[in-house]
């Protein structure tokens, strides 16, 4: 684990906002083993970069705090590039950018240094002309003997280096068995036996709390048993409740700490967490902001899903329940949009047990990220919720019917599960057979057996009401054409949480009325 990290940049990368976010914090952290090789060819898809990009990149990176090296002839100045890398490796206290000026399509007699070669193939005729121009007589995919010889020597060199490292680690393991075991678990990704026992459990007698606060309890409990758990917030730690109380801040002079201060860099934060997750199976990064601000980092979250990276996205202030901050801060379409994204778990817990269950699921899923949507407002600890239920995605928390034939099924998520439960009580007093279902994760429920899904949502029962303080988009799949989805299909408003729930019709009374219409 004493390696360097190399990053390849193009002109387009330098224009993207996320690169500035990442490069800014890399310099702040003094990441001396990060070396970026910038292919400076001044060509973009639409033409010369002069049409949109004229800044002095060298000075910008120097201002950020990077060491900057310029290789003026990148087409065949191999010795200069090699020397630049050695110089970069010698700089220990800051990252290095090596700007390598090149000609795009170098060697092509008709298309070099033109934007036509940026995103298109040369074509058979131009490939042949390029081969002749470069003096390359070999057949396609042929590797000349001198290249084979140069390349093949790296195999025994690599084996020797690996053997040396393993011997060094074996010696370290004898001297420091506990530290070695911890390091090995981070390298292999093997979870400690019984780690899930650290998750707190709750009863209805426990005081109610916002799920963001319950999330912090779970994070701190897990940090004691999962040494690879680390993360932080985009300048909202005191609101997202993501601080690990047993750790200090990860900074240039304290790299052993686990609280990461990402600053207001949502996109960069997500991208950094992807890198952490993909570096070692035993590293479990989490990052946090308000749920609505996932709009600033959605590209990184999509990459998490695409790359099968176990990143835990802790997203608080998950609905109109956040109150007076109003529609700019109130997520509406976000739950639906993440449910539409492949290979990502969207989890919306209702109380302490479900929050613990969400964290158990997030840690266990090695090949996909998880998004936890958490409330700002206080919620009760509900009867019938469980960690095991969350693992199924959807499950029954209460039911007074028999024979898997309730008169109506009320389906709630997160803060609205309480509304579903209270509406169920009202209807039962009126003699109705009511099943209340917590639907924490659509994705997990979809993965259950047909028999299990039928036991929760029997196909014979078409009287179904869903309650969620977000877009109703997609709920037709759950409630069916004869059911009713109660939600919000417009932007929110600035008002106290209780008042705004009434104004938007997300109330016990509205659920009861909808259920009666369907029965």
Swiss-Prot record:
One of its GO terms (molecular function) is metal ion binding. Thiamine diphosphate binds at residues 12, 41, 118, 266, 293. It catalyses: D-sedoheptulose 7-phosphate + D-glyceraldehyde 3-phosphate = aldehydo-D-ribose 5-phosphate + D-xylulose 5-phosphate. Transmembrane segments: none annotated. Its EC number is 2.2.1.1. Binds 1 Mg(2+) ion per subunit. Can also utilize other divalent metal cations, such as Ca(2+), Mn(2+) and Co(2+). GO terms for cellular component: chloroplast; cytosol. Constitutively expressed in leaves and roots. It is found in: Plastid, Chloroplast. Mg(2+) binds at residues 11, 41, 43. One of its GO terms (biological process) is pentose-phosphate shunt. SMART domains: Transket_pyr (SM00861). It holds the Pfam family Transket_pyr. It comes from the Eukaryota. The keyword rRNA-binding does not apply. Substrate binds at residues 118, 212, 239, 317, 325, 376. Homodimer. Catalyzes the transfer of a two-carbon ketol group from a ketose donor to an aldose acceptor, via a covalent intermediate with the cofactor thiamine pyrophosphate. Belongs to the transketolase family. This is Transketolase, chloroplastic. It comes from Craterostigma plantagineum (Blue gem). The lineage of its organism: Eukaryota, Viridiplantae, Streptophyta, Embryophyta, Tracheophyta. The gene is TKT3.
